[in-house]
């Protein structure tokens, strides 16, 4: 049973029906505060101000019926508010229409207050879990990807699956020199500022921030959600990162671009490696802690390309180049390189 104070908005053109639901729920003593609206237009105007935990709406009302009200609520900034449709018409066709309009549940008006309360609790638990998942995913991936995950969970790449992904590793060059020359709190401030801008590029381009790696990061496109332009998105993110580094250097030059101890200018640069290929995606770790990540040869190659990249350089693997060859993304062919763990030289390309 849910505990605490829960504000319920009841929308019904019948004053008697509104009062019946209000008195019945409040009499249960479960912490419900019920606010009644007989005009659905007024309910739409006030939902942002009232901020209900849930909306109970009659199906048949003049002007806007319950389905239209539900649809408008789901299209508004209050779209996260769950909606239960109350009706005397409990036909399968009406239930289907209600659920397609976005209703979270469909309850017959003849149901007892105990059943209605149980339905409210069930919907609110699901909504709470969805919101928890939204906040969790939002720390690592873009809002658009979060909404896609929540809307179509069947499209999510789960543990043990092997999708084609594009992996990006970015590493800050010259950071060790900076760390040795500035106070620790200033070093942390600089690192957070840089990684914040790099993370923004990942999220803006629809990627998933896999992990921070000291003075760098790993990002993935293609898991947990696959898109046909994942490789292009990763390359666009890499270019945004390089632009961000230029802007950061210009904006903070007086603070951290000059290092008197070294007697020469200290310039932070970025090296980036990108590679595409099959990888195992899923929760990796032990019983105490796990994380959703990707592992495999494609990931290892991306990391080694990052290590090879010079300051201000973006290196990409062959599969990444193939995936965007039909788009306007200029590459420069470089001599193949030998990488640890690979028997044959690996084709290499510089992103221009």
Swiss-Prot record:
GO terms for molecular function: adenylate cyclase activity; ATP binding; metal ion binding. Mg(2+) binds at residues 171, 215. It catalyses: ATP = 3',5'-cyclic AMP + diphosphate. In the C-terminal section; belongs to the adenylyl cyclase class-3 family. The modification 4-aspartylphosphate is found at residue 58. Inhibited by adenosine and GTP. PANTHER family: ADENYLATE CYCLASE, TERMINAL-DIFFERENTIATION SPECIFIC, ADENYLATE CYCLASE, TERMINAL-DIFFERENTIATION SPECIFIC-RELATED. It comes from the Bacteria. Its EC number is 4.6.1.1. This is Adenylate cyclase 2. Binds 1 Mg(2+) ion per subunit. Keywords: ATP-binding, cAMP biosynthesis, Lyase, Magnesium, Metal-binding, Nucleotide-binding, Phosphoprotein. The keyword Lyase applies. Gene3D superfamilies: 3.40.50.2300, Nucleotide cyclase. Residues 7-124 form the Response regulatory domain. Its cofactor is Mg(2+).
């Amino acid at each position: 049973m849910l505990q605490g104070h829960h504000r319920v908005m009841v929308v019904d053109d019948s004053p008697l029906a509104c009062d019946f639901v209000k008195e019945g729920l409040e009499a249960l003593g479960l912490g419900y505060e019920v606010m009644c609206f007989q005009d659905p237009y007024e309910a739409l105007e006030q939902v942002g101000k009232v901020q209900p935990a849930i909306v109970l709406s009659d199906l048949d009302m003049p002007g806007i019926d319950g389905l239209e009200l539900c649809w408008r609520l789901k299209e508004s900034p209050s779209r996260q508010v769950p909606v239960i449709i109350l009706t005397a018409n409990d036909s399968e066709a009406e239930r289907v229409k209600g659920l397609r309009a976005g209703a979270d549940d469909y309850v017959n008006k003849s149901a007892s207050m105990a059943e209605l309360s149980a339905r409210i609790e069930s919907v609110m638990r699901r909504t709470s879990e969805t919101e928890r998942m939204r906040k969790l995913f939002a720390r690592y991936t873009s809002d658009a990807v979060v909404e896609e995950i929540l809307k179509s969970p069947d499209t999510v790449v789960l543990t043990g699956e092997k999708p084609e992904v594009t992996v990006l590793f970015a590493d800050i060059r010259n950071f060790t020199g900076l760390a040795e020359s500035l106070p620790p709190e200033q070093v942390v401030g600089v690192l957070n500022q840089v990684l914040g801008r790099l993370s923004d590029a990942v999220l803006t381009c629809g990627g998933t921030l896999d992990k921070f790696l000291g003075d760098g990061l790993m990002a993935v496109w293609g898991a947990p959600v696959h898109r046909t332009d994942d490789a292009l998105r990763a390359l666009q993110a890499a270019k945004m990162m390089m632009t961000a580094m230029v802007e950061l250097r210009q904006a903070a030059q007086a603070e951290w671009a000059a290092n008197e101890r070294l007697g020469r200018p200290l310039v932070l640069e970025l090296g980036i490696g990108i590679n595409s290929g099959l990888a195992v995606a899923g929760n990796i770790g032990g019983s105490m802690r796990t994380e959703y990540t990707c592992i495999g040869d494609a990931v290892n190659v991306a990391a080694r390309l990052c290590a090879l990249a010079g300051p201000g350089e973006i290196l990409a693997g062959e599969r990444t180049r193939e995936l965007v060859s039909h788009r306007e993304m200029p590459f420069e062919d470089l001599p193949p390189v030998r990488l640890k763990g690979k028997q044959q030289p690996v084709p290499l390309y510089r992103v221009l």
